[in-house]
Amino acid sequence: MRKFLIISCLVLSFTYSQESPSFISGDANFYYISKLDGGGLIKLPYRILNLSWGHQHDQFQISSRFALEYKPQIDNYSFKMDNPQDFLLDLRELYMTWQLNFGEIRLGKQIQTWGFVDENSPLDNSSAYDYNFLFEAGTERKIASNSLAIDMYFNNFKIGPTTTPFHSINRLPSSFAEFPIELPVTPN
């Protein structure tokens, strides 16, 4: 709760400053997944609220994405989801961008996407996937990792090296989940 209050105060103080532009956007999702054969609810986690916030000052920008997630209580649901709460505030991204003449440098917890083929690219393995959100689109399925990324622009070309000290692994639903698709391999 204390972290939430500190983050809220920082967001409000940066948002209402006179000198630098800030933005806030988000959406609320009120939906559910039900079974076709009986109409019962499928107990999968989902994001009820998404919030994006950013603040720019000269060449520096700080960006963040928060999500309020509902996680059903199922025993041994997943090795990463062992929190006893139903609702969880998830800090999806928080990173700083330094914009330079030749490109930009980003440092922090961020979701990496590479090009237009983000959905199916075999090269796009810098951010892990959360298969509990398999039916979401784009970056909503990805897990952010602490990383340093540089985007350099040369005429019509873009070079983007990235490095991360800790690589996140894909998050798979366990065999106890009510996942509608059978996975070919499940972790022990």
Language-model-detected regions and their locations in the chain:
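Transmembrane beta-strand segments of Gram-negative outer membrane beta-barrel proteins
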Residues: 18-37, 60-64
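Surface-exposed beta-loop-beta
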Residues: 178-188
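Sec-dependent N-terminal signal peptides
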Residues: 3-13
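Outer-membrane beta-barrel biogenesis signature
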Residues: 15-25, 38-40, 111, 166-167, ...
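Positively charged n-region of N-terminal signal peptides that target proteins for export
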Residues: 1-4, 18
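Solvent-exposed loop/turn segments connecting transmembrane beta-strands
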Residues: 37-43, 140
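Short catalytic helix/loop segments, enriched in acidic residues and glycine
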Residues: 42-54
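Outer membrane beta-barrel
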Residues: 56, 60-179
